[in-house]
Amino acid sequence: MAATVDEHAASEVLKGISRHLNCLNEENKLTRKRALESIKNQTVSKELPSDVLQEVFSSLLKPLLKCLSDPMEKCRETTIAIITDFIRCVPKPEEALPYLMPCLAQRFGDKEILEPSEEIRLLAVEMLALTVEVCGRHLAPYLNEMTNILKRTIVDPFPDVKKESCKCTVSFAKSVPEHFHMQAENLVKPLMQTITHQHSRVRVSVIEATGAVIQHGSGKNMDDVLSHLAQRLFDDSPQVRKAVTAVVGDWLLNMRDRYSYFHKLIPLLLTSISDEIPEIRLLAADLWRQAGLQWEKENEDDIKDKMDFLLSPPPHYPPGVDRPGLGCRELVVRNLSRLVPAIAHDVTDWLVPTRVRTSQLLSVLLLHAEDHTTQHLQPLLAVLYRACSDTERDVVNNCLAAAKLIGTFVPPPVFLKLMLEHVMTPNSPSYPWTPLMVLAAVLGGGSKPLLNPHLQQIADTLVQPEVSQEYQQVMYLEQLLACVDVLLYQCEADCGLISLQLLQVLVTIQSLSNDPQLSAKALESVHLLSKVQGLDSIELYRQHMGQLLDWLSASVNTWSSYSPQRLQLHIILMQSGPVPGEFLNQLMPLLHSCLQPNRDTEMRMSVFTMLAKLLLDAKNTLDSQGHFCDEAERFLSDVLLPNLVWHAGRTAAAVRTSALSCLLALLHGGAITPGQLLSLEVKLSPLVLSALDENSQMSRLLACRCLSATLKLIGTSLHHEALNKIYPELLKRLDDSSEEVRNIALETMDLWLSGLTKDYNPDLCAPHLQLLFQQLLLHLDDPDSSVQDRVLEVLKKGSRVHPSLLQREAEAVRDKQRSPHHCDLLLQHISSLPHTTCSNRPT
């Protein structure tokens, strides 16, 4: 009875709109528009009973579908609105599908878009989404039509159409899960074409649709999809990254064939655990925890034997880090062999964000793998070595954090067996420091009790010449220093066992470094090495000086200007204060060997310069024990004098200059006694006097200073013949081109005259004195008044030696000088002297 009533009501409605239906075929577009509006007002807008609407819809559907091709946009828009309202209101919308779906497929699913209006295409897709929602599984027979439509609308130029199409795809996949897989792969390509759209909301919708398509698909396109999703993990939009995280987590939990894809899905989800946005990190961690728990339940029988000991954390677990659940750890462990090669590939990607995220992922994986890392140590180390040469600092820091976990979870005997070999023979000649860099990080993650038995092995490797002396790059030396520092901080007082080796390495770093900051850091480490043993740095050197000198002496015969040993010697002697004076019996043979005239010239210059610094402060260095005098005479005769012998060439001249500076320091520093010097004066004086004629101003200056120092020490003990050989050479220097040399020559002449004793017979040596006075009187008329003043003072000293001779010579030249002023002052001074005879002798 009710059906009859509904049929009658529907018939009445249809009669009322029959004229409007006829008008739909009119040529006048306004007529068609008004007809459609009237149909809408008298049907769906009238709130008729649903059964009545069902009957009316069945009769109106075909005419309405024809209107989808109406030339007038407003007519098409109204038509879609009417059909949409009918689908929403009728109890059995699926009855319209046989006519609706082919029409929509023809209009919106062809290769070329027939509908030019973006807004109408959007309304059509919204209508399609509603159809999927209300018809559900009834759409299964129209799988091809739906797929064709979505293939086109997903790549529609209008962003809103794309988004609505993606939502429709998700709904459709869930509505017909048993059939969707047959066409799912046809939607992958348009989705991947759209996944890089400029609008982030579109990208989010595409990712969500991709999740549904793969979830309910056959899995054939998983690899293509994953590569695109992996790129979206680096998206600038947090919402996009969050969508990827949610989709991947859902796959891990719910995809039918998820076990086959664990090794591909796990890296994506774990990458999000390191995301910069807390919300994404929390979401990823929660999904990962759920995946682990689910895996535990599904594999309970396999892991029940491991439950007891796998639940307790390993010793020395990183503080402040939450340990992942058993299921999560097992998931990583069982897939690690397939994950490590992927990490190795991506960590060298050309895109910086990819390398950064991959390096972050490595730490997360190792935190899950724990002691299972041991099984994959070789490829993991290769990854770390390669990544630590990256120019991006974040990549390097992340990899060093991962390396620290290796030290935490892998036993030292295992990682040292591989790593020390890599340190000895780096695989990359361009980046030889990476094994040291990784070793320092690994040692930093180790524990003191486990490292202690291996300290000797580590230190013996670091001190090897091919490790500590082979490379001079600052980066290499920094990493070598980092290895020493980490041992000092990790093992502290136990480093006393390897104190010598560590000191040797630190000395080598300082000797090879051209970077003042690095040298300063190495010196700080020397102080730390002292401190952990309860010593100061001087005591540390005292403890090891004998061994250090033996270490250097072993190779002294092969030293050259390029040998690091000469620089090591410099560092040791300059930093050890008074200690060298306690080991002269070992030090002096070493110095004798490397300073022989036949040895490398630049090396000798370097060593002489160093010795000059030490000898100037001999009481606090080489002569700290007062024993250097026992070696001084031999050092002077066998080392210094042979290096003062003249040889042609600039390099030979430079060696003589450095030897003169060392001689001067020896004379000034008080490390040689007057008696020792006097015994060698016959050999020494000719060489020093010869140096007064050197081309080098510095050599002439040093030679003058050496004569001055010699006269101070033994001037009063020299025989008159020795004295008479000195002054002619000094007189030549009064005409030197260097004012400084002239000044020192005058000072030395002053000392020469002051040092004359009663043993010097002025009458016997009158010709010498006459020549001396004549030359000095010439310079008394020097254009430089300051020189005149200094010469006057020297002549006043000479007036005490033979005043009458000087008076005669002064009177003879007085009238020849440009100004007699200084001559008059000299004569006045001589007149004021006590009465003397011509044969007066100095007192």
Feature names for model-found ranges:
Residues 1-843:
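Extended, low-complexity, acidic/polar intrinsically disordered regions
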